[in-house]
């Protein structure tokens, strides 16, 4: 029996990483059962030292994440040392910005135990609008990211926008782009919960769901408070259940993000029956109907926002007060999200030896 070793990003209650930690093993097991596949043993490689705190404006804590990853490397090393890793086993690293990839490939090559590595890419230095891209304007990060890319057999991206940006900004040779695949992410477990909230009574409020960080332009959301009841969830300290209730009771979800490779909070809102108002850029441009996209220029900077604010306010107001005009487009968006972005079957196929994706 082959083994899939899951190398998770540390689970943080306020982030989807906690849901991933709990649900990815279930998703893999359900896929195996549904298709009647040969069973895999699924082992999660936990780390130590993580906590629920995050560095301000970031997805995780920049110090304790290294403790967590280092202890994962220790555990993986013991598995190789004790003969628990066999030829043909798989590693799924759920955040590819993880030096465990280096250790896995190092041991696999030098101990002559061929394994397959799958890495899911999220944020990184390769995106100049991400916090890593803004804070680490150094020579070493792109070399590190390219090394991890080449060490993986499969690199997974949530959107075509994300994949294209990665390959372009890291100047990946064309002959090596076959390692980069687009797949939705493993979030299907949230679909029933959010659809059940779609009948929640909607209030005349605009929800802004992002981290309070420069790449999300919170100052624009603050400026919109002169025209709307704007709820900035980052300031509220909500747990996941309370956050979903706040989300589902809003008429509009608004983004002015300069950086977005997928946008989980927007998908959560749309499934809850909330109308999205999004810039025509980043991943939004490929994921959502034109009815929900305003010109990117309107919020490409705070200066531009102030210039175009009247047009943006009217754009939001129309969708808030006349939701019936956008019901059909909202249904299309919901179907697209569920079928293409909240499921990861394309990633699971090679992970489970279903030969529909060729590296």
Residue ranges and their predicted role:
Residues 299-358:
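A charged, aromatic-enriched C-terminal amphipathic alpha-helix characteristic of glycosyltransferases
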Residues 134-155:
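Membrane-proximal helix-turn-helix segments that form the acceptor-binding/catalytic region
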Residues 275-278, 285:
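Short hydrophobic beta-strand element within catalytic cores of glycosyltransferases
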Residues 182-226, 230:
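Conserved donor-binding/catalytic core segment of Leloir-type glycosyltransferases
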Residues 258:
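Aromatic "clamp/platform" in nucleotide-sugar-dependent glycosyltransferases that forms part
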Residues 150-195:
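Donor nucleotide-sugar binding/catalytic pocket of nucleotide-sugar-dependent glycosyltransferases
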Residues 1-103, 358-359:
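N-terminal pre-catalytic "stem/leader" segment of glycosyltransferase-like enzymes
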Residues 90-96, 109-131:
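Active-site proximal beta-strand in glycosyltransferases
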